[in-house]
Amino acid sequence: MSSIKIECVLPENCQCGESPVWEEASNSLLFVDIPAKKVCRWDSLTKQVQRVTVDAPVSSVALHRSGDYVATIGTKFCALNWKEQSAVVLATVDNDKKNNRFNDGKVDPAGRYFAGTMAEETAPAVLERHQGALYSLFPDHHVKKYFDQVDISNGLDWSLDHKIFYYIDSLSYSVDAFDYDLQTGQISNRRSVYKLEKEEQIPDGMCIDAEGKLWVACYNGGRVIRLDPVTGKRLHTVKLPVDKTTSCCFGGKNYSEMYVTCARDGMDPEGLLRQPEAGGIFKITGLGVKGIAPYSYAG
C-alpha cells in the first residue's frame, strides 16, 4: 500500500455526507447529505452532480433492482424515483419516538434493506442515548425489528460467505459480528470483533473488501482503518486531510478505488480554514485491494 493517493474529487461542502454507494451502470457515486435532505449522484466521467431534495433528513441510499433507488428518509423506508425527483413511502418505524430518525443503511445479499435509527442529535454525536433500533425492510415491504437500545446505529456489511453480519453502534466504540442466516434474515450470537483505540475516535460507516477485511471510517479520527474481523487486528490506517470522516465504499473500475464521505457540521471557522475540504468526497487509490459490488433491494 505504498502508492496510496488521496484526492478530494468533489468539494461538495456536505454538512454531513454519508452512505456512499457505487452504481456501476452509470459509473456514478451515490451519497447523501443528511441534514441538507439531499440525495446526490456524482458522475465520475462527466464530474457532474445531480441532487434530489426530500422532505426530511435522508440518512442512507441504496440501489433498487428496478434501476432506481431506495432511501431512509426521517423514520421511513422509501422508494426513490430519480427522474421524477419523488419518494414513495414503503414503511415507517419508531412511530412512538418523534425525535428519532434513521441513520446508516445497506442492502443485504438477499435484497433486504437493513437500517437503524437514533435520536436526533443536539450536536454531532450528542443525543439522548438508547433510543434507536435496528430494522430490515423485506422485499414484500414488511419490516423486521432486531433489537433496540441502540445509541447511533451505523456501519453494516456482510461476510463474503454470507454467514456473518457486521454492525456498528457508534457509542459502543466497537465493531460487532452476528451469526447471519441468509434465508431468513435472522441474526444471533452478538460479539465484538474490534474495539476502537482512543485516537481512532468514533466508528461510523463501514464496508467489506474482496478479501473479507473490514474498512471503518472513524468520525473525528480523520481516517479509515482496515480490520481483520477474524483476528481482531487492525491491519492498516489511511489518514485523510479532514477529521470528520463518516463512511466509505469501493467503486470505480473493478471496485479498485475507495470513496470516503465526510462532514463539516459543528466545525468553527478556524477549523474550516484548516480543513477546507471538509464535507467533500474523497477518492483513495493504490490500496492494493478491491471491493465488491453493492446489493440491490429486491422489493
Swiss-Prot record:
A divalent metal cation binds at E18, N154, D204. It is found in: Cytoplasm. Binds 1 divalent metal cation per subunit. Most active with Zn(2+) and Mn(2+) ions. The physiological cofactor is most likely Ca(2+) or Mg(2+). Signal peptide: none annotated. InterPro entries: 6-blade_b-propeller_TolB-like, Regucalcin, SGL, SMP-30. GO terms for molecular function: calcium ion binding; enzyme regulator activity; gluconolactonase activity; zinc ion binding. Substrate binds at R101, N103, E121. The active site is at D204 (proton donor/acceptor). It catalyses: D-glucono-1,5-lactone + H2O = D-gluconate + H(+). Its main location: cytoplasm. Its EC number is 3.1.1.17. GO terms for biological process: intracellular calcium ion homeostasis; L-ascorbic acid biosynthetic process; positive regulation of ATP-dependent activity; regulation of calcium-mediated signaling. One of its GO terms (cellular component) is nucleus. The keyword NAD does not apply. Keywords: Calcium, Cytoplasm, Hydrolase, Metal-binding. Its cofactor is Zn(2+); Mn(2+); Ca(2+); Mg(2+). The modification N6-succinyllysine is found at K144, K244, K253. It is an enzyme of class 3 (hydrolase). Monomer. Belongs to the SMP-30/CGR1 family. Gluconolactonase with low activity towards other sugar lactones, including gulonolactone and galactonolactone. Can also hydrolyze diisopropyl phosphorofluoridate and phenylacetate (in vitro). Calcium-binding protein. Modulates Ca(2+) signaling, and Ca(2+)-dependent cellular processes and enzyme activities. This is Regucalcin. It comes from Pongo abelii (Sumatran orangutan).
